[in-house]
Design a protein with these regions (language model features):
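Conserved structural scaffold segments of CAZyme catalytic domains across common CAZy folds
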Residues: 76, 83-86, 99, 118, ...
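Short, well-ordered beta-strand segments enriched in hydrophobic/aromatic residues
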Residues: 14, 18, 117-125, 602
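Acidic-aromatic substrate-binding/catalytic surfaces of carbohydrate-active enzymes
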Residues: 9-98, 157, 250-253
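Active-site-adjacent "subsite" loops/lids of carbohydrate-active enzymes
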Residues: 334-337, 341-342, 349-420, 498-512, ...
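Active-site-proximal substrate-binding groove within the catalytic cores of carbohydrate-active enzymes
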Residues: 218, 231, 235-237, 453-602
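Acidic, contiguous internal or C-terminal segments within carbohydrate-active enzymes
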Residues: 85-146
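Active-site and adjacent substrate-binding regions of carbohydrate-active enzymes
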Residues: 343, 404-466, 472-483, 535, ...
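Aromatic- and acidic-residue-enriched carbohydrate-binding clefts of CAZyme catalytic domains
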Residues: 311-334, 365-400, 433-458
Length: 602
């Protein structure tokens, strides 16, 4: 395969024999043809007049949202070398009455031996201007017959596509563990992904029309992406598209999985990460709520039934009610240290909950420590404020770049380990909640979005791991955003959506050999005997996740003996398969045929 650019009187084509893009010559940009995988036509002609939308911010407060029609289309330039060929499409934008224009350049590249097309964007700006938001690329492709959309929410979600439907991935978060979308039917899969090795916050979206589906990435930019000296804006990643006739799993394995090994979060094996052996050997977790005689009795009964080696994820141990007064957890409830000791004497492990993201503005510490100085700020200076049904109090989102917040979380990690003698600490929401643009001027990062969110959390957890985590202790977090995999010993995977979709094994297809996960989804909160508990743990087992994460007061009820026995049998089976579950590869989902009994699970 050899990449090349071909020009005719009517059009320009960039391709390599496997993929090609044809754009007609003329006064306006559009796509005549985009063929992927040796000839699979992907576009309806003349449906791609708007490949980008950019919002500018000028020095006087100008704030235009500009489309290609607001500029002058200048055609294209050609760039070729020994390994790739690119066509750079150019629009001149008039942003002032200076003689010069300010071009936007969209580069589409074909490389040797690749079945993908690569899309990049740059723009020139007047001095002091920035681009504050970007939609790029915007690519409308043919809607396939009986098409389905797969997003990377949690384990992965598959949706029946509906006209007018919008399918979104907010990355990195529980709704977007990876930065890709897959549209497929029985004939193959369209692949759309950003190759961002810095895990910048972004939204990938597919909007379904009657004949076409528009894929777009939308981002609140970082002002640091505009060079103050040159006035040049660079979108700091490449977007790729492809088509795989072997389906969505083949696309993920052939293109996305290799990309992850080029990222700092994807190139580390489990063996290289110094994970305590007791966690590698773990098969079962329970989730205790509270510090009472009833809870402790249920924990002991669980250990009696399942044996030693259970992990106990402890909640409601702190001084105030759950989801209130964060981060003022201490003093712990008086009986909690004894509870930890009892669990450990029975050769099990206990790891308590804290939140790594929220600061209650009514908490004593928010006033005493000037928590407002650490809060994440919107562009208008106000706070991101959230209310959870568990508490119905205000919680503000804290910027992870704040040095004050680092000091608080590190202090909590120290105190929990040194005073309560736990087996580590669980820090909620870090690998689950999406980044927020921050415009605070005192946090040491450029205003807006960008990579500061991920890199700030990485610096925080690296500091805990390198200087504060006691020997053989663990730190883990909620959900499975890919960039956080090597920061945490384990990820608690419970937030995959269920409504109007099917859960599919996209995440284990890509990452099963480089991550330890616990659970499959939230277990029942009132009754484990209705069928869903067994289904959840079956899926947990099949996806390679550590089992359970169940309330022991429910599991140890007399009426739940069938469920407890099922879970113990599954645990004993899993215990014999650690060579598969630790660094093993998830191959594919297999549904056995035959006359198998079926039950309806509510």
């Amino acid at each position: 395969i050899r990449d090349r650019v071909e020009e005719t009187a009517d059009a320009v084509k960039v391709g390599n024999g496997s993929v090609e893009l044809i754009v007609p010559k003329g006064k306006a940009f559009n796509i005549q043809s985009m063929k992927l995988n040796d000839g699979e036509e992907m576009v309806v002609p003349s449906t791609n007049a708007i490949p980008w939308v950019l919002t500018y911010k000028g020095i006087q407060g100008e704030n235009p949202m500009l489309f290609p029609e607001h500029g002058v289309y200048k055609g294209y330039d050609v760039i070729q070398n020994d390994t790739s060929a690119s066509v750079v499409f150019v629009w001149d934008m008039r942003l002032s009455y200076e003689k010069r224009m300010y071009p936007i350049r969209m580069k589409v590249t074909a490389t040797d031996h690749s079945e993908l097309l690569y899309w990049d964007l740059t723009a020139d700006l007047p001095k002091g201007w920035v681009i504050s938001k970007a939609q790029f690329p915007r690519i409308a492709v043919v809607r396939p017959k009986d098409g389905k959309m797969i997003t990377s929410a949690g384990w992965g979600n598959e949706f029946d596509m509906a006209t007018g439907g919008a399918y979104k991935v907010t990355y990195p978060s529980c709704t977007g563990s990876m930065q890709l979308l897959l549209m497929h039917n029985g004939e193959g899969s369209f692949y759309y992904a950003t190759e961002d090795r810095n895990a910048c916050g972004k939204e990938l979206r597919a909007v379904c029309g009657s004949k076409s589906v528009t894929f777009v990435t939308e981002v609140v930019t970082s002002e640091g992406w505009t060079d103050a000296t040159t006035g040049r804006f660079d979108l700091p990643w490449t977007t790729v598209v492809g088509y795989n006739p072997d389906g969505w799993q083949a696309a993920a394995l052939q293109w996305y999985r290799p990309f992850t090994f080029t990222c700092e979060w994807g190139n580390k094996s489990l063996q290289s990460r110094n994970i305590p052996q007791w966690l590698l050997d773990k098969d079962l977790w329970i989730r205790s709520k509270g510090v009472t005689d009833t809870v402790m009795a249920a924990i002991n009964k669980t250990i009696d039934f399942f044996g030693e080696g259970i992990g106990v994820h402890t909640y409601y141990w702190h001084n105030y009610p759950y989801d209130t007064h964060y981060p003022d957890y201490f003093p712990a409830k008086p009986e909690f240290e004894g509870m930890i000791s009892t669990i450990q004497k029975r050769k099990c492990h206990a790891v308590p909950y804290i939140n790594g993201r929220l600061w209650d503005p009514a908490a004593d510490s928010y006033t005493a420590l000037n928590g407002a100085s650490a809060s994440c700020r919107k562009a208008d200076g106000t706070l991101y404020t959230e209310i959870y049904p568990t508490s119905k109090v205000l919680n503000t989102v804290t910027c992870p770049a704040s040095s004050l917040w680092h000091k608080i979380i590190i202090g909590l990690a120290d105190k929990i380990q040194n005073e309560l003698h736990t087996n580590g600490v669980y820090i909620d929401q870090i690998a689950a909640a999406a980044p927020q643009p921050c415009f605070a001027k005192n946090h040491g990062h450029a205003a807006g979005g960008g990579d500061f969110w991920y890199k700030s959390y990485k610096a925080l957890i690296d500091s805990i791991r390198g200087n504060h985590l006691r020997k053989d202790n663990i730190v883990f977090s909620e959900e499975n955003s890919e960039c956080y995999i090597p920061l945490f010993d384990m990820l608690l995977t419970v937030n995959t959506p269920h409504a109007n979709c099917r859960i599919v094994p996209l995440f284990p297809t890509v990452y099963s050999d480089r991550v330890i996960t616990c659970a499959y989804t939230y277990t029942p909160t009132a009754d484990v005997t209705k069928g869903e508990f067994r289904y959840q743990n079956m899926q947990c087992f099949l996806y390679g996740s550590q089992l359970g994460w169940v309330d022991p007061t429910l599991l140890m009820r007399d009426e739940a003996k069938t469920e407890a026995t099922f879970l113990r049998t599954l645990m004993e089976l899993r215990k014999k398969q650690h060579d598969i579950f630790i660094e093993g590869r998830y191959i594919r989902e297999f549904v056995p045929g035959g006359d198998n009994p079926q039950i309806d699970v509510p």
